[in-house]
Amino acid sequence: YSIMLIQFTVENHRSIKNSAVISFAASKDKSFEEYLLHPDEKKALLPVLAIYGANAAGKSNVLHAMMTMKEMVVGNAAKVSKGQKLPWEPFGGTKEPTSFEMVFIFQGVRYTYGFSFDAKKIYKEYLYHWPNGREALIFSRENGVYEFRENVNEQVTLSNRTPDNKLYLVSSNDWNLPQTENAYR
């Protein structure tokens, strides 16, 4: 499997106030084992997922949140200039940041990428991977303070060029940073 979504989490977006999680992790039930996907030894994943619920329960807003995250990473919203507003649509007019997180597997390596933001800035952003089955930080950012494990000097220079309203993952891709290349794809 080249790329596979394991889990998506959204908080404070449109009608979604508290954290909502969409997970492809299979239960321990062995009834349909032959249909499950096994990208690694640890977890079996569902090949499809259904979202169902009452009218106006937020199903479409979960999908909208996924599309907003995608738009901020690879779409037009990724090309923000300094001071430009971000596509922030919080629950009920609250002033709290919106948070998105995605756990996925790319070329056999598990990644966790997430960020929180409002209309003006990115408050928190992080990227972890599990290259040898152990969690390793690629980068994190909280209120403008960055942390890196590799290529520190190059990444510090790049982080200084990243405006408050732009995702560091997008900036690192713009500058062809090898540490974030696979996660960005």
Stretch-by-stretch model annotation:
Residues 15, 106-110, 132:
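Glycine-centered tight beta-turn/hairpin loop motif at sheet-sheet or coil-to-beta transitions
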Residues 37-44, 48-50, 54, 63-122:
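Conserved P-loop NTP-binding catalytic core
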Residues 4-68:
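Pre-Walker A-like glycine/lysine-rich segment at the N-terminus of P-loop NTPase domains
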Residues 10, 104-106, 129:
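Short acidic, glycine-rich loop/turn motifs
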Residues 9, 23-25, 103, 116, ...:
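Residues in well-ordered beta-strands of folded domains
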Residues 112-185:
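Electropositive, glycine-dotted interaction segments
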